[in-house]
């Protein structure tokens, strides 16, 4: 066992880690449960993505020992179900949140992208999301979510149309309903 010191979401941690323990395993042990393992540590699903020293990484593919002295951000750094950040709310409003497994990593990556790019292109959005295996929706809703987040950051609210309704007479199916579990 080795002791490391790192900062996670602005909190300092002094942690005992085993030699081959993954960064993801350590983060979950510390209570950061948004860091998922949907690919048995293979590195293709991307649900284990964290921001490590201001760069996206797969936490299952890193050893916890590599985090000594590092600054790490997880999806918990963005907001709570009662106080979402602009990207999280925009993802809900755009109808993109269909998988609670992918959503934390996608929201974290889009938040990180908007911190680095004032007006990201579709190619930049594609690039930042390319590490997440997304099967539940296409990218169009993610583009809308980024546009909505930018609009809210600049104007404080949306004037653009959010997730479309498919038929006015439907109560739930085919009609967007904003809901954040938690």
Residue ranges and their predicted role:
Residues 1-182:
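Signature of N-terminal electron-transfer/Fe-S-associated modules in redox systems
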